[in-house]
Amino acid sequence: MERTLRKKRTGRVVSDKMDKTVVVAVETKVRHPLYGKTINKTTKFKVHDEKNEAKINDRVLIMETRPLSKDKRWRLVEIVEKAK
């Protein structure tokens, strides 16, 4: 599988307490099937951060990868925006 076919997501770092791992919350907008209201749905991913460079509230780009542990299937590509 080529790297260009892998899923990419953008989200915010909500936890950086683990070594070489950050938790990234990705928010998507979903319409309710019956009522039609737009709802914000948040999914949390454990992301591999080799250099421990992402900090809390950073906006990051993540990419799907091979399973690195029981829960980690994503890796950090770049930090889009640093936290203030």
UniProtKB/Swiss-Prot annotation:
Example of a GO biological process term: translation
Keyword Transmembrane helix (UniProt): no
Family annotation (InterPro entries): NA-bd_OB-fold (IPR012340), Ribosomal_uS17 (IPR000266), Ribosomal_uS17_bact/chlr (IPR019984)
Pfam families in alphabetical order: Ribosomal_S17
HAMAP family per the UniProt record, alphabetical: Ribosomal_uS17_B
PANTHER family associated with the record: 40S RIBOSOMAL PROTEIN S11 FAMILY MEMBER, SMALL RIBOSOMAL SUBUNIT PROTEIN US17M
Similarity field: Belongs to the universal ribosomal protein uS17 family.
Function: One of the primary rRNA binding proteins, it binds specifically to the 5'-end of 16S ribosomal RNA.
Assembly and binders: Part of the 30S ribosomal subunit.
Protein name: Small ribosomal subunit protein uS17
Originating organism: Clostridium botulinum (strain Alaska E43 / Type E3)
